[in-house]
Structures are given as structure tokens and as C-alpha cells.
Amino acid sequence: NEDCTPWTSTLIXPLPXCRNYVXXQAC
């Protein structure tokens, strides 16, 4: 929920700490 970016999340998926990952957007 801190270093969450749509681009990074789309590639590796949701990052640690990231919740509610939907449609390429995290947190």
C-alpha cells in the first residue's frame, strides 16, 4: 500500500502490502 504503481502491479502483480489489486491498479 506504499510503493504501489499500476505499471509495476500489472507486471508482477500485486506488491507486498498492497490490497485490492484490480485491473492493473493496486491500493
Swiss-Prot record:
Q: What else is known?
A: CM proteins would be involved in the cooking quality of pasta.
Q: Does the keyword Secreted apply?
A: yes
Instruction: Give the superkingdom in one word.
Output: Eukaryota
Xref: InterPro entries: Allergen/tryp_amyl_inhib_CS
Question: Where, by tissue, is this protein expressed?
Answer: Developing endosperm.
As for family, the record states: Belongs to the protease inhibitor I6 (cereal trypsin/alpha-amylase inhibitor) family.
Protein role: Alpha-amylase/trypsin inhibitor. It could be involved in insect defense mechanisms.
Keyword vocabulary terms for this entry: Alpha-amylase inhibitor, Protease inhibitor, Secreted, Serine protease inhibitor
State the organism of origin: Triticum aestivum
Q: Where in the cell is it found?
A: Secreted
> A Gene Ontology CC term for this entry?
extracellular region
Q: What is this protein called?
A: Alpha-amylase/trypsin inhibitor CM17
Please name the GO terms that the record assigns under molecular function.
Answer: alpha-amylase inhibitor activity; serine-type endopeptidase inhibitor activity
